[in-house]
Amino acid sequence: MGNLKSVGQEPGPPCGLGLGLGLGLCGKQGPASPAPEPSQAPAPPSPTRPAPDHSPPLTRPPDGPRFPRVKNWEVGSITYDTLSAQAQQDGPCTSRRCLGSLVFPRKLQSRPTQGPSPTEQLLGQARDFINQYYNSIKRSGSQAHEQRLQEVEAEVAATGTYQLRESELVFGAKQAWRNAPRCVGRIQWGKLQVFDARDCRTAQEMFTYICNHIKYATNRGNLRSAITVFPQRCPGRGDFRIWNSQLIRYAGYRQQDGSVRGDPANVEITELCIQHGWTPGNGRFDVLPLLLQAPDEPPELFTLPPEMVLEVPLEHPTLEWFAALGLRWYALPAVSNMLLEIGGLEFPAAPFSGWYMSSEIGMRDLCDPHRYNILEDVAVCMDLDTRTTSSLWKDKAAVEINVAVLHSYQLAKVTIVDHHAATASFMKHLENEQKARGGCPADWAWIVPPISGSLTPVFHQEMVNYFLSPAFRYQPDPWKGSAAKGAGITRKKTFKEVANAVKISASLMGTVMAKRVKATILYGSETGRAQSYAQQLGRLFRKAFDPRVLCMDEYDVVSLEHEALVLVVTSTFGNGDPPENGESFAAALMEMSGPYNSSPRPEQHKSYKIRFNSVSCSDPLVSSWRRKRKESSNTDSAGALGTLRFCVFGLGSRAYPHFCAFARAVDTRLEELGGERLLQLGQGDELCGQEEAFRGWAQAAFQAACETFCVGEDAKAAARDIFSPKRSWKRQRYRLSTQAESLQLLPGLTHVHRRKMFQATILSVENLQSSKSTRATILVRLDTGGQEGLQYQPGDHIGVCPPNRPGLVEALLSRVEDPPPSTEPVAVEQLEKGSPGGPPPGWVRDPRLPPCTLRQALTYFLDITSPPSPRLLRLLSTLAEESSEQQELEALSQDPRRYEEWKWFSCPTLLEVLEQFPSVALPAPLILTQLPLLQPRYYSVSSAPSAHPGEIHLTIAVLAYRTQDGLGPLHYGVCSTWMSQLKAGDPVPCFIRGAPSFRLPPDPNLPCILVGPGTGIAPFRGFWQDRLHDIEIKGLQPAPMTLVFGCRCSQLDHLYRDEVLDAQQRGVFGQVLTAFSRDPGSPKTYVQDLLRTELAAEVHRVLCLEQGHMFVCGDVTMATSVLQTVQRILATEGGMELDEAGDVIGVLRDQQRYHEDIFGLTLRTQEVTSRIRTQSFSLQERQLRGAVPWSFDPPGPEIPGS
């Protein structure tokens, strides 16, 4: 399809195969193994469906079924075509005659059958296709596979036919191109864009679909392969047909003297167009209108808008007179009269397009005697001797015509490929197919180009021609024979009617294109913010596309191969990991193979989390395939995701060392697998204008997608409209309805957070700090009741779902406008607009929250303590009665810098905002639909189940602080404050989140260094308890560990001092070092200082010489500083450069021997946070202006020691 011949009214290629290569080209083929040639040797049996990694045998195979032996006469290589055993149809040749040079062998034409197709025949073809599809997605034999086969069988039994799913249609259309033996450009088969037009009902709708196909495929000269599939053939109903052989063709006018002006190949269709009302011109290059036929209706005439047809005037780079010949040709070759067969289903109207091979225009269209026949005219202009063939005037003129074609298309920036590049790519395709499928059907007579035959590699390559399914097949012209049902001549349409048809088409184009261009929006989220952004993106893309919004764990990654447009919005969890609901997606994405990394390499077997943490533009692997991708062209193989266009937006915090690591990795991986990036990676920093960054990226992504798929005429206006506060929430579209059911808390939390919740109970809460300390750190002991869902291993995390403070809830309830009764469970209902063919307009329940009272929603489910987002401030501005408050809220929501300064200085709760802007009304539906969800709080488990069965211990710093530089209101940590006030027996909703990358090594003899200041000691308590159990119960003698702890003062906050000393005396620890940052009379010391001054040699020995492990737990600044210190230690002690030491740490991470458990920002990181925000402001502002790409990431700040 990369270079398609017009197959409607053109004769075949020249005969004369040369070198005897025609032998066996078209030997009679059957569904079983073909009869071998005398020179063939027996070959091994072919599996029903060869495995993708099948390699061609290079030696004579053992006895068994015989397969064609295929030789390349240029290099002498030999392969065996085992795929030919799966041929679905007999070829036209017999044992006594070769019909390989016939253009339209009658045996290969697909003709409508009288009555329904035999059920068993259709079922056999359907089963074979469904098996192919499920093999391709590696789901063969699965329950879904068996269920699909049963569905098809039942549908065929009931209706005599069946319907393909959209993914099956996409797969089938691509396979049909892949199986086309006469196409030389098949290496790009994976990049075919499939447009599903099976909902088409009229010829007018056909024309609209075709206009969109032409617009998309032409793409302002950067041609893209595409196919539009109209409804299938059905028993008892006529066909959808396109009478033209190509969507764009030049008219041929028969003159009185018998000559033809224009293209002689199109005389018949030209006369038919005139009979159906077309007013012809009299030029040599008049674009024909289209004759389109809906079932059982006469054909209708439609004129293509002139601006839709891209044409290239032909000129020569050195022959100035060539332009005066007035030659031109159209850019887009789009074959429209062939039938697409998939799984026994026939689609008589399935126009497909690619791009030209230059010799198709330069030799066949312009030089063939029965076409434009310009060869002698050009030769005369070149002063060549045309009286004798020995002057080779034809060859010389033909070369210059081809040079002119290539030059003109390249000058006009229109995609075209020369015959040398095209045939070289076909040889690569043959090699790929031999490895993947064991063979490749190819018609030598059509593959060898009509110029420079033996100068191209395909001339010397033997080929085997056979016919697989799915396939493109020839079919009779619709106005001839039995196909002419309903093809009567209609009255001539007036010019006004034709013009109106064009006008109607133009108005419908965007609507219909949107109807069939689907967009998948995937999100991975820990806090719900990525989900909220994805839903906003869905509302935006609904303006011009058919979007669906899915969580990553609800999506089958194999569907990526059949997607046209995917947008990803994802956060990054902890130390650069995927969010939990993105882990399965990440793993599956890593397992896929791409066009530039298909060979197995050790580095590709890294843990997907580890590789995600390290993927960057400087990664040698990434740089290698990115260079190959940049150098690729239309003659290179497409990847598994060749038709995919994608955009990625990442959410994160630049305070973390792996900022947006998962989003970066998804963006990198999708490109690596062959996808086309529409927009550079977008990144939203929670420290600086995240929402504004998302809005700017979303609008840019929407505009890029609209331009790519030729939809959405006013993309910018649509984007502005969707982000308007008046559009995002309207009073009249929401209402409260009373519900009979009352809230059950655990099921309610399970519903909201989409994960199973369990109830533990408090055993005790103990303050670990001295009574003289002004701060508090508590040890919380929970009773799990032996519940299986609360089982854990040391190093794992627990998620706790806290309630909001009752006083804060009551104060907010007093501000609610017209609240429902306090004890009455309610649910929010939203007024949904109806859609044609969809559900009617009506009130639909919002599923975000379970039925509950407003007080319960504010207590358990909604976040009322975090500063309101700019989007929420914009909504509140529309509800303010005072104009000054409305203007202030609007200004805060629109100015990112002003908003960030306000947020970080005041850190206001929702109640404090309402107190600052008292005229704001607060409707209950707005609270229930627009406030963010109250997120679980994660803590490292501080116990070992072997030491405390049925219990979970937590070490929690109780948070309390004043905003506005210590002069503002007192704020409390939601979870830590709540847990500090609990009593024995109180319930705690919670769940376990495993941390498999932060666990002690299975071999207890490996040395370990543990580094954790403050509450960073929490997971290590579980470690030493587990080791004590190994020593005293199991009788093991593990290698002593080294603990490096840090706190402020030895007399106030030295956590677990007695426990640590006891563990050291009993053999768990070899060394225990403590850094005090504020001890009176002692220098300020941090844990990284102890590593550098006391443990440098041991760090190097443990990590580089003894295969040991290092564990670091703490906030982001401490973890980063420790990492930098370890890097310097390895460089100094190991005698290496700093960069080399960094590579060593990368290897340690790959081997999972350097472990980090990083928790969020604390009050100590405020200085660093402020500095990061300051650096990020200018970046964000430049991104929004378009001055820098979205993926630009400045160097991280220098982070001081903790």
Curated annotation (Swiss-Prot):
Cofactor binding description: Binds 1 FAD.
Lipidation (N-myristoyl glycine): G2
Residues the entry annotates as binding (6R)-L-erythro-5,6,7,8-tetrahydrobiopterin: S101, A445, W446, F459
UniProt superkingdom: Eukaryota
Keyword Flavoprotein: yes
Gene3D superfamilies reported for this sequence: 3.40.50.360, NADPH-cytochrome p450 Reductase, Chain A, domain 3, Nitric Oxide Synthase, Chain A, domain 1, Nitric Oxide Synthase, Chain A, domain 3, Nitric Oxide Synthase,Heme Domain,Chain A domain 2, Nucleotide-binding domain of ferredoxin-NADP reductase (FNR) module, Translation factors
EC number: 1.14.13.39
Residue spans of biased composition, Gly residues class: 15-27
Residues where Phosphothreonine is found: T494, T1174
Calmodulin-binding: annotated span: 490-509
Subunit structure: Homodimer. Interacts with NOSIP and NOSTRIN. Interacts with HSP90AB1. Forms a complex with ASL, ASS1 and SLC7A1; the complex regulates cell-autonomous L-arginine synthesis and citrulline recycling while channeling extracellular L-arginine to nitric oxide synthesis pathway.
The name this protein goes by in its record: Nitric oxide synthase 3
Gene behind this protein: Nos3
